[in-house]
């Protein structure tokens, strides 16, 4: 009995101490607190939804906010909340962004599009300009496309 108890205690302690704590946190995200509010979206109501940050690593103050308007498309704001661009691409519900691996000035934005029941991929430049809709993949097996992340 003593051997079994000792062995179980040893295993439990080993598991608890087998990983060092992550004191650095994640390098993939940063918590921020809003100081300003963006201009309202076209549709009003509760149409403003998901957003992501187009992070400008060279000039952080020139980073942008890419947001979805669930009844219109994609809206791009500066960090002061001023609307820079609006793109009528369909009823975009959620958006996410990653920097392009092939170009320092390009970003890949994904969005779920309820108009076409599709997942859309777009190329944006660092100024927030939509350069290309590279993919619109219709997902007929889903009743409603909802949510996306890279």
Q: Across the structure, where does each feature detected by a protein language model lie?
A:
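Structural signal for beta-propeller blades
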Residues: 73-75, 116-119
